[in-house]
Amino acid sequence: VITAEFEDFFLVTVYTPNAQNHDENKRPKRLDYRTKEWDVDFLAHCKALEATKPVIFCGDLNVAHQEIDLTNPKPNRKNAGFTIEERARFDAILEAGFVDSFRQLYPDATERYSWWSYRAAARSRNIGWRLDYFCVSQALSPQIQDALILDQVLGSDHCPIALILR
């Protein structure tokens, strides 16, 4: 987590730890750490900052929030990044007053992904997940002009995303 303070807002960049697939109980190995510690602490950090001024946070949150945020939701329900617990923690972010900038503008957009496995030519077939986000404090949501997924940019299993504010 890197937090930068600007005159009118805080910008927080984050890599959220992957819950990792599966232990002997067929559940992600670090799911409890991810959902009961990391996600809780990260949201508390953002809310503490927000007490002073609005917050923008961005990065790899390692969760596909909705079924439309990945190609194959049904077979992935128990996999890291799409468990009920991880999705519920993203719900908590929204309930705490943060806005998923992409979904605010494109609530029904499908096949818009920011990550593709290196296996089985997933990227060329657009079999992916939307794991990367720009979330903003509710106070900033009217200023969202666009939220972009730059899926034509190569060089990683993730692609860049961008947020344009008025």
Stretches found by the model and what they are:
Residues 1-166:
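Active-site regions of metal-assisted phosphoester/phosphodiester hydrolases
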